[in-house]
Regions:
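N-terminal juxtamembrane cytosolic/stromal segments of multi-pass membrane proteins
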Residues: 1-52
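Alpha-helical structural context
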Residues: 33, 90-91, 116, 139
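Juxtamembrane interface at the ends
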Residues: 79-98
């Protein structure tokens, strides 16, 4: 079983192994994560995290809130990777591509499994930004400052898009 790539055919144990590695050893995870290999496995991983988030958010906050929140999260995952990639490449001369950017964002979605908890929700979102920052360093070969600036630029632009929707 690999802890650097989620393989759905290996079942729930594989999900738990990858989730644990992303959350507890993100530098090691992103170091070992292949920047290529397709969209399917990372998006399934993100989908499982999103389902856990949605189901538990329904229980805690009710269906209307859960639907609204999952819609906004989906928008962030639709626009966010593209904005990250464009900011990285055009502003900071990053070397990565869209596939690697989407993969790092999908695995940063591991935080969704904790974001439904009222007291921890905001911390989970902040930690997901940290995970994206770490992934940007590796996938786009950016130094720490450029990775941080890219993450902040993408956060601001994505937030503005979500606010306008």
């Amino acid at each position: 079983m690999s802890d650097s790539e989620f393989l759905p055919q290996e079942g729930p144990k594989a999900f738990a192994l990858v989730w644990r590695k992303v959350m507890l050893d993100p530098r090691g995870f992103y170091r070992d994560m292949p920047a290529t290999g397709g969209f399917e496995n990372p998006l399934i991983f993100l989908g499982v995290c999103g389902f856990v988030y949605f189901a538990l958010r329904v229980v805690v906050f009710g269906l209307p809130d859960a639907i609204n929140t999952i819609f906004l999260i989906a928008l962030a995952y639709i626009f966010g990777p593209g904005i990250l990639m464009l900011a990285s490449q055009f502003v900071f001369q990053g070397e990565g591509d869209y596939e690697g950017t989407l993969r790092l964002c999908a695995y940063a979605g591991a935080c969704l499994a904790l974001a439904w908890i009222p007291a921890l929700g905001i911390l989970a979102y902040v930690y997901s930004l940290y995970l994206i920052f770490l992934g940007m360093e590796k996938v786009h070969r950016l130094d720490t400052t450029k990775a941080a600036m890219t993450t902040l630029v993408a956060l601001v632009v994505t937030s503005l898009i979500i606010i306008w929707v």
